[in-house]
Regions:
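Phosphate-handling DNA/RNA-contact segment within nucleic-acid enzymes
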Residues: 1-94
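TOPRIM fold recognition
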Residues: 52-160
């Protein structure tokens, strides 16, 4: 299990893995019917935010990887290869009907790097689509927040 908090004892935000947890078992929103597609996110909040932006569509699996480990932006990125995520490997083993992977990582260096790595690793066996947020540096949570603020503003203007 992945732990994330606003503040630690020093007043800084923190992220950590719960001791003894198993990355194979990750947050997943199943489709209401049958589906051959899985959308893959860095975090569960991204999956829920993207689902909100898609008006609650339940036509695909939405799987969180519980974070990604990317190299720092710079020279090292060309040589480092990403390990296949345990959560996605286990999911695909358990769902052989899945033929399409939609990569919905963040649109920052780490997310773009992970998207390219995962596409390369899975495109021989699956149809792989990169679906990053259109805004540079954003994740789907940022876009959902923007959409909510826009909706509030429009409602306020109509109420005048």
């Amino acid at each position: 299990a992945f732990l994330r908090g606003i503040y630690d004892s020093r007043g800084k935000s923190f992220r950590m893995e719960q001791e003894g947890s198993n990355k194979q078992y990750s947050f997943c929103v199943p489709p209401l019917g049958k589906s051959h597609r899985v959308a893959v996110y860095e975090a569960c909040i991204d999956a829920l935010a993207h689902m909100t932006l898609e008006d609650g569509r339940t036509d695909k699996y939405r799987l969180s990887l519980g974070g990604i480990a990317a190299p720092k932006e710079g020279a090292e990125r060309a040589t480092k290869k990403m390990k296949r995520p345990d959560a996605l490997e286990y999911f695909l083993k358990e769902h052989p009907e899945v033929t399409e992977i939609e990569l919905c990582t963040d649109n920052d260096f780490a997310g773009r790097w992970a998207c390219a790595q995962l596409k390369e690793q899975y495109e021989e066996k699956y149809t792989v689509v990169c679906n990053l947020p259109q805004m540079e540096g954003a994740d789907y949570g940022d876009l959902a927040k923007q959409a909510g603020e826009k909706q509030k503003k429009q409602q306020k203007e109509r109420g005048r």
